[in-house]
Amino acid sequence: SSDPESAAELHVENFAGQAAVNTSRPVAMPNGTTVQVKGDILGPWTEGIGMGATDLGVMAPLDDREYAMVFGDSFTGKAFGKGTWMSPTGVIAETDNNGFVTVQRPMNSGSKVEKLISYYQEGNLTLIPSDIINIDGTLYMQAMWNNGIGNVSNTQIWKSTSRGREWTSIGYTGNSYMGGMGDLISWEEGDDGYIYAVSSSFKRADPVYLSRFKLEDIDDRTKWELYDPDTDNWTDEAAPILSKNVQAGEMNLRYIQGYWVLVMFNDATDAIEVRISDTLERDWNDVPVSTIAKAGSWSDKQSPTNWSQPYGGYIVPGSTIDNLDVVVSQWNTDTNKRYMSTQFNVRGLDTFYGIDSSELPPLREVVPAKDEPTGRGNGGGGGASLSANMDEETERIVTIVGVLAGIAALAAMSFPYWRGALPPQLREFLHI
């Protein structure tokens, strides 16, 4: 095609990572790091799983080799909006001997990708994952109920003891919590018994906050402690840890070789940025920024210095400070032709941050994910249940539904009218 935009998109699509064919050459960035586009996560090599277009791709290790990879809005076709719409979806992946992320199979049972959480999907309702984590062999996932992207009604946390085939709800939080600044999160386990979470709104307009909690409190965010960098105290009131020239989008926090690594899409700079610090409890405005993907025109060749409409940014398990793999999303919102998660490789962050990589400890050992038999035999069903932390309105609705369930005929006749009034977490529980 003579259309420069189509040519640019074809250039990206030809990053055939699995065979190391047409992978981009490493690009020297202004700060001295080197960034290489390794290739798209999906392509001809993954057609068998029934998913052709997707974004995000948050990851958590399952063992020393495989990792869970969870995506947002996904489609069976090869462009945004083409084919069946599913969210969230997941695959099991690993990194091959050449350093490429390779999809092995769907996370759910069966040979085709399905929604990980079962719910009635109508209108603009969608469930977008924030992050996934492996704690002592149990997977935990936090996701946001959106009535149209950016319009978060509430968030929910699930757990899985079947390597992601089946999920059970354990916690529900209204978006009034932290004034919405706790909707979008990324979490990581520290070495001190706490799990730490960075958070912001899902509007790409606000700063970054820091929380911590014990595992037994993961389902009750009112028990999470909030950090104030001005006082260096943990209380029930938060202040931003990162706010200067920042409008936080998707984030990923990981503890790697004794350092806290934060990857983030920053809408203020229209770039995917990396920040690394040996201390988490600090003012992150003082941490130097390393850009790994900068927005640019679709009419120009796609590269780390011109990656049109980027977002996301998720660290691949097994990454090290001096060899960091990050999955970056890209969506051409004008044509919807280009909608994909793509692997980037970053070298030289150790030098940029003054870290002697030869002195770094090995990566933390991975506790193998539990692989218990699933009760439903269908990972697509999600196995979800209502949170024990329902608010009063939800409890009231549950009571009403119970009465309606006892009057089967009336319930059937009334269904079209009361279904729309139910909150997403109740629809998910009832699978309607």
What is the role of each PLM region?
Residues 401-417:
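A cross-kingdom C-terminal cell-surface attachment/processing module
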Residues 421-432:
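Cytoplasmic C-terminal tails of single-pass
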Residues 357-375, 383-386:
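Long, low-complexity intrinsically disordered regions
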Residues 3, 7-50, 61-123, 134-178, ...:
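Beta-rich carbohydrate-recognition and catalytic domains
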Residues 53-62, 121-136, 180-193, 247-256, ...:
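Structural signature of eukaryotic scaffold interfaces centered on beta-propeller domains
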